[in-house]
């Protein structure tokens, strides 16, 4: 009789990366935090990083992704209730973000570097779950717009910035309509004076993210034109029609809503709603940039960890030249995105308005556009294991296009940059002055800077290429000034000399081993 044999032993599989400290493992973030003025937040980041890389946090994230939100429009008696049911793990994740003041830190503690520290916290916690950061971002971003109405700010800002999930409040936005999309001036929702200084708003919104928010900023037409209003989610005229069945961020309820005589309170000047709400939009665009950089970082960490523990054809993947090329290319893309996100966040601390507005628009376009390609290549580094839901890589890939669509898709973002050169002529010179700080540090960057033309004279047809060239100039400048020579050299070689059609096409001579070693400090 044959002896019993096992079908197989589990060999040559990478061990789980968790538990690990997301912050401590990220040398690039640690350096950027210090460089951009947020060094005082190290302990806060280390504490958040430990939780973000814990098995507990990862399990909560996986659970709320499996148990998607569900809308109950009516109770058993037929009464309208519009209740969104969310998994307890969603509340756990959101509570952690609120208690760590990711939604409010710069407004509660406006010292130098607070936007950088807050951006770093956003970057770390986004690696746990991207969907949960949407209400966090909107609440953070609503404050500058709300301050256009001092009485409303006095009433709501204390609650919106409170680091308490139970006693605080969350803010959302509702701008997009069926017929207009990003063209909010085509909105048909209208607001009529109610006779008490407020307005009655009637209409619809095609996208309203996180309808459980306590308050929303929205746009509606008045006799003076498009205006910005604050509405409350508890208003009986605020009706959730359905939840969106989306490609990604499936833990996050996004909805269609109707306003049936909802009470609205004017924010800013009547007829100047776009000018008012853009104060919110600029901050959410910053968070789109941070979120995409965070996704790149998470994908890179998974790819490098896998390659360090997986062997093929007699060698670890991380020791094989072509895999080193791919990993190094992913690493320089991630480092450039992280460095840029933190530099732009510093501009919010410094109130450097011309650079801040222009750089936010440029880098939101570029980094968010690069994220899906980066996610796909990181997934492929894990082979078939990366194609399986349990790895988390499919979720990363599904989530990655969102930030390029939110707050203006690629074309809208690129055209905004061109318009900014005309409407805010000080923006481009401020941006170029930052790029020029690296002049003389690398001949390839110098040549790239010389090639950049006057955007105000270029047609819309070339907008994406032009804005991409600007983005690469800033990224290369930051790396030449601040990154190790191996990183800066590889980036300039791959991004400024016409190569890099796919990740993993770095030219010969780059120090891929050094770059990959730097990528994950565990």
Question: Which role fits each region the language model picked out?
Answer:
Residues 396, 400-439, 467-475, 483:
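C-terminal catalytic subdomain
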Residues 198, 202-238:
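A short core secondary-structure module
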Residues 1-111:
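Extended, charge-enriched "interface" segments that sit outside catalytic cores
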